[in-house]
Amino acid sequence: MRHRHGLRKLNRTSAHRLAMLRNMSNSLFQHELIKTTLPKAKELRKVVEPLITLAKKDTVANRRLAFARLRDRDMVTKLFTELGPRYATRPGGYTRILKFGFRQGDNAPMALVELVDRPEVAEAVEAEAAAE
């Protein structure tokens, strides 16, 4: 019986699945909005939310744990300098999954994964203009 096995295999080897989720996590932290299939989005949430919770407390040990999972110094820096303080008062639920129709080629259900409370694009452009 397949009771209490907590992850989807996504038809990949364990190394491929780990690398894919690592790359998707880095993309989500970089762009704060990505489009993927619904099962991948649900698995990505299980990876990203603990990392953001880890980033709420900026210690060397937490940075090393995050780096072990992400393997990207720039994203670890962004995680601890921008995202950790942004979600410091939120007790979880940092991501939002929005269903986004079906992929044309194989009719796979698609989803948008975004970080909640992310700055809107217009606000970011205005902030850059004000900085100049």
UniProtKB/Swiss-Prot annotation:
List the GO terms this entry assigns under cellular component, sorted alphabetically: cytosolic large ribosomal subunit
Top-level taxon of the source organism: Bacteria
GO terms of molecular function? structural constituent of ribosome
Would the keyword Transmembrane be found if you checked this record's keyword annotation?
A: no
Alphabetically sorted, this entry's keywords are:
Ribonucleoprotein, Ribosomal protein
Is Ribonucleoprotein there in the keyword field? yes
Q: Which GO terms describe its biological process?
A: translation
Q: Which residues form the signal peptide?
A: none
Q: What is annotated about its quaternary structure and interactions? A: Part of the 50S ribosomal subunit. Contacts protein L32.
Q: Which HAMAP family match?
A: Ribosomal_bL17 (MF_01368)
The UniProt family comment states: Belongs to the bacterial ribosomal protein bL17 family.
Q: What is this protein called?
A: Large ribosomal subunit protein bL17
Annotated organism of origin = Ralstonia nicotianae (strain ATCC BAA-1114 / GMI1000) (Ralstonia solanacearum)
